[in-house]
Amino acid sequence: MRKSYKFIISVVQTKMKILWNLKLINNERLLQIDNCVIAANHISLFDPPFIGSVFPKEIHYLAKAELFKNKILGKIISFVNAIPIRRGTIDRNALNAVEEVLNKGDSILLFPEGTRKSNKVKAGIGKITSETGKNILPIYIQNSDHLWQCFFRKKKLMIVIGEIIDITEFQSIEDRKDKYRKIAEHTLKKIYELKNECENS
């Protein structure tokens, strides 16, 4: 991990703990994570840095291409391994970049629902994991959209680390679109099952 990257995530971690009452559940599972697709629900602009900061290794992200038009912001998010993706279309360049990241042994954070305003799963994560053979780490984040309540200790910023999803069982499905869809739906189901751990802690 680059020293500058490590400094950035340590600052984010400190802010999450002190300002927003962070509770990280199942953090011991992070030590076993290497080269996978990290899949999480998406409720806030802060989700990528919050989730990324809990990992002991650098990870990569997808960010909408419009953000890179701002030169300063573009440099910042590129520095923390963001990959631009064009929304509303099949962005082959972004998909190729994601596969390149995974094939060289790194991990990438994806949001199966695509955007914060969507509650429908996108099949993209199924395509990526099926074609690269990489497993999926589900993560559930709660209250990143209620930071003021977290600041005043009315809520906790919570991140739950799930168990690795082995996609091997899906690889025998012959219809590719059906396979991608089933992987994506199963992943989203596993993400939202982690919500129970927030409520029980």
Q: What would you call each of these model-derived segments?
A:
Residues L22-L24, A82, I159:
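Generic structural signal for residues in well-ordered beta-strands
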Residues S10, K17, L30-T89:
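Catalytic core of membrane glycerolipid acyltransferases/transacylases, capturing the structured
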Residues T14, E28-L30, I51-G52, G74-K75, ...:
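Short secondary-structure boundary/capping segments
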Residues M1-W20:
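Extreme N-terminal tail/first-helix region
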Residues E28, A65, R86, Y140, ...:
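Residues at the C-termini of beta-strands that transition into short coil/loop
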Residues T14-I33, K155:
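N-terminal signal-anchor transmembrane helix
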Residues K3-S4, N93-S201:
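Non-catalytic C-terminal accessory region of glycerolipid acyltransferases
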Residues K23, R87-L95:
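Glycine-rich, highly charged phosphate/nucleotide-binding loops
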